[in-house]
């Protein structure tokens, strides 16, 4: 696979290997035309974010081993769906993100200015 790009226009960096994340379960927020959920935002999830997602209908806490999903806890890195992340931001529940590990396709959903407000990997 060709190296994909992040929202900063650089090579996409790894998001998490423990738990193993990504549309391809390769540790990166890589995507393709089959990823209808656009799992492209590398988030460091918080309890508040996870609880909000569950209440809103996207349970990221409960494990689903049949889908290779371990269930998430506070502090885990995970490639979150861009549309769900946008909804969380609107609701005031956005969690920290790693821009260097967030896929450029996220910019189709959220502007870079919004993403930078939650970035924890900019100096």
Residue spans for each PLM region:
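Extended boundary segments
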Residues: 1-49, 112, 119-121
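Glycine- and charge-enriched low-complexity intrinsically disordered segments
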Residues: 103-123
């Amino acid at each position: 696979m060709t190296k994909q790009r992040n929202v900063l226009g650089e090579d996409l960096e790894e998001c998490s290997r423990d738990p193993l994340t990504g549309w391809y379960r390769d540790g990166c927020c890589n995507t393709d035309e089959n990823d209808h959920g656009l799992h492209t935002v590398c988030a460091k999830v918080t309890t508040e974010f996870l609880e909000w997602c569950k209440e809103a209908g996207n349970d990221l806490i409960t494990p689903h081993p049949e889908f290779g999903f371990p269930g998430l806890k506070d502090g885990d890195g995970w490639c979150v769906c861009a549309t769900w992340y946008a909804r969380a931001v609107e609701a005031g529940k956005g969690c920290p993100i790693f821009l260097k590990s967030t896929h450029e396709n996220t910019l189709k959903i959220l502007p870079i200015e919004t993403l930078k407000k939650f970035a924890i990997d900019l100096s």
